[in-house]
Amino acid sequence: MDKIISLKYNSQFKKLYSKGESYVSPFFAVYVKRNGYRINRLGITAGKKIGNAVTRNRAKRRLRELYRLNTPYMKQGFDFVIVARFRTATAAASKLDSDFRRLLKEAEVLRDV
């Protein structure tokens, strides 16, 4: 299992918000931008509107796992920021997965398998 490379700095997130393309579902928003490397990098955010720290961390764990499961099907060389929304922590995993795959198809980052 490969390690997920994280976006760590505020400037990286801001660049993605301003110059990346956004794709939205009822459960989360995904920002995507080419990064010029041969790896994908991930950033996950969950604002205080989602709930207390326990709920925010649960939402982030679910999104991280969703990304991990779909990584083998994704093209390389992109930065992703996934912004959790209120229903992320309570939605069915199958619904999250189908929405995430739909957004990846829209962003044209899924490999042709």
Give, region by region, the residue ranges found by the protein language model.
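Positively charged, solvent-exposed patches that mediate nucleic-acid binding
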Residues: 1-113
